[in-house]
Amino acid sequence: AQIVAEELHLDTESIVAALLHDTIEDTTATHEELAKLFSPTVADLVEGVSKLTRIQYATKEDEQMENLRKMLIAMSKDIRVILIKISDRLHNMRTMEYQTPEKQKQKSFETMEIYAPIAHRLGMQKMKWELEDLSLKYLDPVGYREITEALDEKAAEYDGFMSAVHDRIVTRLKEEGIDATVYGRMKHPYSIYRKMYTQNKSLDDVFDLFAFRVIVDTVADCYNVLGIIHDLFKP
């Protein structure tokens, strides 16, 4: 419920439903009782989350896709159902260290195959990145540790580089009279992991460790910025 309230900023009924999301599944409470005590909408949300909880996940690709379709169908009825479910899974992943190794791998696999892709489809990139990173932590602990430790060791160097690039872009845009907001970030561990292990590269051989985003007001400015970026940093 805390994730629903503080990170997704959903409405009151969603927060109440998040607090009650296991009620139908784990107690004798019924949809009718929840509707009477709270509201029909809260009851519908809780019931929707319970239906997703009952989906059985498997390892075969076609079965995973069927699970994905079921969740997408649930989304079409009320998007808040899937938002609550993804928030619940994120909370579970954040506290996964208290589970058995077998449970950790099972839940991490589900998260990587089902929840992270749906978060991506919904444009919830920050949540998607965290779900992927936490899943990697349990699916390949050694690989996760190698990457995070290497990133920690080079944090000061990388921060300095990103700051320099950011300032260079901002300065040039001001010179060109373009009003823009520039954001920079380090790629997250799972993204780097995929590049390293699928292409058999070391961290030093991965050149796209950083991502920058330039927000402008018009399409014309967008194309102007693209030209400026290409001028500053040859593609």
Q: How should each PLM-predicted stretch be described?
A:
Residues 21-48, 124:
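Hydrophobic or amphipathic alpha-helical targeting/insertion segments
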Residues 23, 45, 49-54, 64, ...:
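Transcription initiation cofactors for RNA polymerase, centered on bacterial
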Residues 15, 43-50, 128, 132:
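Short, well-structured alpha-helical segments
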Residues 10-20, 41, 45, 81, ...:
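Alpha-helical scaffolds flanking conserved acidic
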Residues 2-7, 27, 31, 54-71, ...:
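Nucleic-acid processing machinery
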Residues 84-87:
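Hydrophobic transmembrane helix module of multi-pass membrane transport proteins
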